[in-house]
Curated annotation (Swiss-Prot):
Record: residues binding Fe cation: H342, E348, H379
NCBIfam families found in the cross-reference section: hmgA
Alphabetical UniProt keywords: Dioxygenase, Iron, Metal-binding, Oxidoreductase, Phenylalanine catabolism, Tyrosine catabolism
Naturally occurring in which organism (per UniProt): Aspergillus fumigatus (strain ATCC MYA-4609 / CBS 101355 / FGSC A1100 / Af293)
GO biological process, one term: L-phenylalanine catabolic process
Induction: Expression is induced by L-tyrosine. Expression is positively regulated by the cluster-specific transcription factor hmgR.
Protein name per its UniProtKB record: Homogentisate 1,2-dioxygenase hmgA
Cofactor(s) annotated in UniProt: Fe cation
Amino acid sequence: MPVTQFSHPDPYSYQTGFDSYHETEAVKGALPVGQNSPQKAPYGLYAEKLSGTAFTAPRHENKQTWVYRILPAAAHENFKAEDADSYHTSMTTETHKLHHIPNQLRWDPFDLDETVDWVHGLHLVAGAGDPTLKHGLGIILYAAGKDMGKEAFYSADGDFLIVPQHGVLDIQTELGRLMVRPNEICVIPRGVRYRVTLPAGPVRGYICELYQGHYQLPELGPIGSNCLANARDFQAPVASFEDEEEPTEWRLYSKFNNTLFSARQDHTPFDIVAWHGNYYPYKYDLGRFNTIGSISFDHPDPSIFTVLTGPSDHAGTAIADFVIFPPRWLVAENTFRPPWYHRNTMSEFMGLICGNYDAKTGGGFQPAGASLHNVMSAHGPDADAFEGASNAELKPQKVGDGSMAFMFESCLMVGVSEWGLKTCQKVQEQYNEHSWRPLKRHFKNPNKA
């Protein structure tokens, strides 16, 4: 059955469907009937609109949700900037500049960090563009070992696509709860407030923050109406709220232009009793991905493995694609079956959730590690993978069992943060020497005697 068998159970209920218009109420009758903003909302609630697009965005792109909450989201003190040394998402300051270099990069597994919570465990590894212009993306590594307390966090910069590698995320959002485990992903849209606790200990993983637009399912073209990630397999939370009658102190964190701010408020942020709309967090089990491949010859473009895409203004070109390399059968005849050698106008950031990646059999690309092949930086199978695939018996072969590699691909030239290039001390200085310098010359010129 194409469903991941998770060791950690999920206690929550969900609504299903990608980009569906959902409605949910934790108290029967909390949703107004036939209108959005009555003079008096049911049960003394406040009506509030959460807009993820401009009001006049085309109907098929329009993202908005009406929420009915105990107190409006505006009821907090002024935000104040946090100490710059307390967080690691800055992109543009003198000490946090991005390095644009053509070298192929690979990182050893990133460390767990049991001393920090979610907010302070976010580290910008790479990025491009500018969140103030709503253009570009940020690639973030997270590692945390502490629950958030009476705190909530949101990013005004973009949508977080979260890829857990280790540990379980119990995410309490304004719109309901999500349990997210390795081999699942979740997306938390711009502005949605949430709190992360860790029911199974320390966590680690990857995030692709999309500054521009929102993630979509890719077009299927001649594939037809099903396959890849099917809309019915995405899960959205149901309404869930806290009812605190006495004032309690909470802290609200905001990531705003990659700078961390905080404000205090005297009530829980998680007080939405009901909501309806199509702007909400969701999760997806990567085990449900319906993989497509060649059943004749040659290796198709890796775009066939796209789960979600964040399109640019140019059709068919993505600010951010999320691509996976799941377990699959290889049956192509007379074919070099691993991904071919490549120079790409797109940048490719890869990570490994578990197992081994079939194009990197020589070691070095490990779970919790990563690689970056930037715009036109040549890459491809390492010497070990080339020799093996060039001489393998071409019988049907199952690859990727127990493995899940992924890629964040972008049309933008990606810069590497100071933390990603130097501070983390995980860059493999011998990446080229290990992977491609050992490749042998096999050419035999037929014109030479």
